[in-house]
Amino acid sequence: MSALRPLLLLLLHLCPGLGPGHGSEAKVVRSCAETRQVLGARGYSLNLIPPSLISGEHLQVCPQEYTCCSSETEQKLIRDAEVTFRGLVEDSGSFLIHTLAARHRKFNEFFREMLSISQHSLAQLFSHSYGRLYSQHAVIFNSLFSGLRDYYEKSGEGLDDTLADFWAQLLERAFPLLHPQYSFPPDFLLCLTRLTSTADGSLQPFGDSPRRLRLQISRALVAARALVQGLETGRNVVSEALKVPVLEGCRQALMRLIGCPLCRGVPSLMPCRGFCLNVAHGCLSSRGLEPEWGGYLDGLLLLAEKLQGPFSFELAAESIGVKISEGLMHLQENSVKVSAKVFQECGTPHPVQSRSRRAPAPREEASRSWRASAEEERPTTAAGTNLHRLVWELRERLSRVRGFWAGLPVTVCGDSRMAADLSQETAPCWTGVGRGRYMSPVVVGSLNEQLHNPELDTSSPDVPTRRRRLHLRAATARMKAAALGQDLDMHDADEDASGSGGGQQYADDWKAGAVPVVPPARPPRPPRPPRRDGLGVRGGSGSARYNQGRSRNLGSSVGLHTPLVLLLLPSALTLLVLR
């Protein structure tokens, strides 16, 4: 037995898996031929790689034992490891960026095109039905759609003012058509605008149409704008997170993971999977967006469902012409009552001379009536897209990326360059210091849990990551508020429209299942000057001048001209019965 002892010691010395320490590979693998072959294929100069192992006292990251790497080679391998890791992360996230960018583009194009379709349909139908009379006043309708686009595309402010200005301008154009026998100077029109802006809402020339239009269009625009902004924010945050520079601690851990086996002369020895997962979790802790990511996706889906349900953008775009027509019909049907109150408050204007009165429209034009065609199918854009299809696609795409950040370390370590395959989990692997089994526990989870990661220090504050998460939280909060009909960028988004009156929302404002909303009280809007082409605006004192000496004759004045008003209604009908 004693004679066999030297032979047993020699065999123990030569066995790679049973060596006395981590440096056993150096005693077995004396040649750097395999390392030279691998690095030569990568374009490394073979002059920098010794043919056999040398002392590793100069190494800064890898174990300072026998090595095939010079200092320069080690630094190049550190850079290569970083490039490999960043490439894997960016490639893994390219689908996510493409998904958010494509959804943003499709929804944005759809909403913009729906506004254009609504404007074109209204102009086409009104122009066909009323010809010259609509053309003369088309500017106020074009201004309305310009204001809606500005809200959606640009500042996100002034939606209330846009709608209120539209109804005020429409009244300034429509009211004189009811009374062509009078001349209406700017002071009278200023008084008219003030009267429709009073807090009590006593004069509602267009009935409840302004309020209903505002409720429908504002909630749809707020939701559409928040959804598109949310998709854009998500795309930008993800793109930034995937391109974050690798920190020094991560660079060194990556070098120990995939670079040091080359320096030890064992490039075929794959890193242990647990080792790779710890390095990946630690490096990606400054990129991951959990748990904000899940809430962000929920906000997108919630808002998308609202947009094809109670806050339907399609329905809102279609209803613009309908609500305007209903408002004009109300003004026509209640013209006597509205005129009496206006003349009582603002006085009776001067009559015009007979030769300058407007001639009535031809009887055949005045007798026209326009009826909305029944809705046959969901509106589509020129590309054949409708909102239902877009929402379905969004839901399907987001289901694929919900666990992206939590699963990114596993995805990275699934690459053959980063770790051993799962089928080789029981085989010896590279532990960071030598051949063996990786015994440290794999640390997953949040930033706080990564403080216990054995491979790199994650305790330093990460301001950029916190900022990105705050961006996601802000986008999520904006989308959830929009799903409730609130615009966080415009504090008065739920207030009632000017001159439209108050009260509960009507049952036909939304599709079935929508919850009625009681609008909060709104302070009176400051009066706006009339917006008539070519007319200046003087002070409000002119209204009082019209009141002086006229109120006592009001009854006879209104009574005298009422038959004339009724006779002239066919002329006004050509503008007022718009749809």
Curated annotation (Swiss-Prot):
Residues 347-382, 483-552 are annotated as: Disordered. It comes from Mus musculus. The gene is Gpc2. This is Glypican-2. GO terms for biological process: neuron differentiation; positive regulation of neuron projection development; regulation of signal transduction; smoothened signaling pathway. The lineage of its organism: Eukaryota, Metazoa, Chordata, Craniata, Vertebrata. Belongs to the glypican family. The keyword Metal-binding does not apply. It is found in: Cell membrane. It is a lipid-anchor; GPI-anchor. Residues 361-379 have a biased composition (Basic and acidic residues). Interacts (via heparan sulfate) with PTN; this interaction promotes neurite outgrowth through binding of PTN with chondroitin sulfate of proteoglycans, thereby releasing PTPRS of chondroitin sulfate proteoglycans (CSPGs) and leading to binding with heparan sulfate of GPC2. Interacts (heparan sulfate chain) with MDK; this interaction is inhibited by heparin followed by chondroitin sulfate E; this interaction induces GPC2 clustering through heparan sulfate chain; this interaction induces neuronal cell adhesion and neurite outgrowth. The keyword Electron transport does not apply. Residues 557-579 form a propeptide. Keywords: Cell membrane, Glycoprotein, GPI-anchor, Heparan sulfate, Lipoprotein, Membrane, Proteoglycan, Secreted, Signal. Glycans are attached at S55, S92, S155, S498, S500.
